[in-house]
Amino acid sequence: MALCQKHLSIWNFALGDSPDCLSHANKIHIPHTWNSRKYSENYVGKGWYQTTLTPGFLPEGAKSCLVFHGAYRDTEVYVNGVLCGQHFGSGYTPFTVDITSALRLHEENEILVSVDNRFSTDALPYDRSFDWANDGGLIRPVDFVATGPASLRDTEITAMPVISSYGKRQHAGAALFSFRTKTDSSIPGCTLHWALFRGATDSITPRESEPLLSGILPCTEHVHLDPVLLSDAVYWHFDRPELYTLALHLELPDGFLSDTSFLEIGFRELKVMGERWFLNGEPVRLPGVEWMPGSTPTLGMAESRSKLQDMLLCLKDCNTVLTRFHWQQDDWVYDWCDRYGLLVQEEIPFWGKQPEGDPEKLWPVACRQMEEMISAHRHHPSIIAWGVGNELSAQTWPVQRYIRRAVAFIHEKDPDRLANYVSNTAFACPEQDGAGDGDILMINDYIGTWHQGFEQSSAWQALVDAHPGRVFIPSEFGLCEPAFEGGDPRRASIFLEKLAFYRTLPCIAGTIYFCLNDYRTHMGEEGKGRMKCRVHGSTDLYGTPKPSYETVSREYAPLMVSRVPGGLSFTCRNDLPAYTVSGYVFCCGGQTFPIPDLMPGESWFWEGTPDDSACIERPSGFSFSPAL
């Protein structure tokens, strides 16, 4: 937030190499991509956007900027004919353009933006080496933001539970809190007023709500709050996503408010120890599904927030706890994951075997994307890991060197999160694959389809033997049509067969099934234009479930329910998934029955006769039907 913020949602738009094309512009609303329109679905090149802005009163020395939440891809920004900024090589990370010197107060200002989605060997994704849509445009919101002469940026927050012992979930207790932020103020005597509140931003009123902690710090270029111990923090968990809000107010010496910021955080710890990982002290095995955004043909990568929410709900409704994104998502997506409980690995879009040989030439853009991604999203408790690449040639030394360098870079920037590489080559020679250089070995397992010549059990055993005492996650498994036959029935059987095997290996701490949905991709085998896709999902392009969706939902439920004489037996799964159920409620016949806390392997008996309305509610409000 800032002193003034305005969404710039209505623009004039046209395709062409120069802004002259705007003489025949159409009026559009942001977010927007030209590749979701029938007349331009195959267009690769430049698009031009034009709008006007008339700022009202701003204080003396005010700073103004445009915040782009995502523009795909190479972007130039002009204000009143002045080139104010460029952002090349990255289409999914947010960026800010300072327009202070070009902006005229109390007058109409012309804003002109060009966006170019031509395939590039200087960008990530690299050239044509990526398996999703090449949708160009202002695909996410654009905001005008103004502050006083001093402003805040790059706030880093530590919100870490103090776990007293490992082996059982801890819901609340002691926690460490600290933060550091940067200011661009050269004005002596500025102060930073801060306060920590319990609750999400929309549930607090800073002037009326009582903060848990607060204080005033003198401002320099770097402002730092030393760690503070909270005695009774409620920990963030995917079933109980408890949020806190850090409010920052930057004041000038005369008391004038120059900038503000509100960041939602959560206290949670995810720790890898040996061949297990622990969430807030509990060893867990977590079920996951990946969703490929941008797949509704009429919206593309410019999906509305209502559509994004529909697909996120689709993830939650099939009992997903863990997911990953091949490319960076809008901050709003992670706000949703924070509030409703999803664990996420966010990745830079470095995908496939291109460029051949040494990827060193891409280090500058990879480094910049990792910095932009971490800076924008590190406060989100839902994000547990960063990804440095997917399906590169990780059996070669140059790629392994890149992976090690990227993992080390992330650890330096964010030591509280995991850094991983996702491999599709690990079965070929397990001991020399780059997957081992991440904190977790993330393995794309297409044995039986893309990966020919391997037997499931022996291939995995060789991989585990090559990396003893490590955590593994099958990060993709599923069926891609029409490359492979069998349709949705085979998709369901592959899911069941793979999951049954994964359950036998204790070192597999989670799974990420691929894919939630059929997805649009420029390299798809089915359809044309905006309909070009891969049939890989348990829903269609629009999110309509196929029969295999129910299979995933049933197998990923944390409770197994069976009929027994006199009622039902509820057993907390002890294979995969495996985590404590706490605060769950059984709903039946218009009544609710609290289920006692059950650790993996424990059972509870309910006396009665279930009817068709029977369902189980999580404490987060999501529910699932028992498989009776």
PLM regions and their residue ranges:
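Accessory carbohydrate-binding/adhesion or oligomerization-edge regions at the termini
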Residues: M1-S40, S114, F197-T201, P482, ...
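Accessory beta-strand-rich segments of carbohydrate-active enzymes
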Residues: Q5-K6, W11-D20, Y39-R153, S186, ...
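Extended substrate-binding grooves/exosites of carbohydrate-active enzymes
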Residues: N26-P31, R37, V82, F88, ...
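Beta-strand-rich binding/interaction modules
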Residues: V79, Q170-G215, S569-I595
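Extended acidic/polar, glycine-enriched regions
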Residues: L103-E108, R180-M273
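Short, solvent-exposed loop/linker segments at the N-terminal edge
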Residues: A159-A175, S562-V564
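Intrinsically disordered, low-complexity Pro/Gly/Ser/Thr-rich segments with frequent PxxP/GP/PP motifs
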Residues: E210-S231, G589-D612
